[in-house]
């Protein structure tokens, strides 16, 4: 489907093995290709490592924000539980 739409728009999507996913350098026929996550090709180990570090930083940031959201959510639930109002009859002797 993607090729149909890219052809329809008048531009073809380049094959993922034609250029480096990071620096966009052309990957030659007889050159080494460094792969990452199965569908990302890189011209050098340095470009590949830079992408890995970038992805790991994004993942750490996502995990940190996810933990923060869970913590805020549980604190809100705890504070709501602490403000419970009980109704009923009070008997004083």
Swiss-Prot record:
Disulfide topology:
none
Where is this protein primarily located?
nucleus
**Per the record's keyword annotation, is Chloroplast included, yes or no?**
no
Q: Where is this region: Disordered?
A: 54-93
Kindly list the GO molecular function terms attached to this UniProt entry. Answer: kinase binding; zinc ion binding
An example GO BP is: response to starvation
Q: What span is annotated as the signal peptide, if there is one?
A: none
Output a single Gene Ontology CC term carried by this record: cytosol
Q: Which Pfam families match?
A: zf-FLZ (PF04570)
Start-end of Basic residues biased regions: 60-70
The induction field says:
Down-regulated in response to mild as well as prolonged energy depletion.
UniProt keywords (A-Z) are: Cytoplasm, Metal-binding, Nucleus, Zinc, Zinc-finger
InterPro entries named in the record: FLZ1/2/3, Zf-FLZ_dom
Q: Where are the zinc fingers (FLZ-type)?
A: 15-59
Q: Where in the cell is it found?
A: Nucleus; Cytoplasm
Stated family = Belongs to the FLZ family.
Briefly, what is this protein's role? May act as an adapter to facilitate the interaction of SnRK1 complex with effector proteins, conferring tissue- and stimulus-type specific differences in the SnRK1 regulation pathway.
* Oligomer status and interactors: Interacts with KIN10 and KIN11 via its FLZ-type zinc finger domain. Interacts with KINB3 via its N-terminal part.
Q: What is this protein called?
A: FCS-Like Zinc finger 3
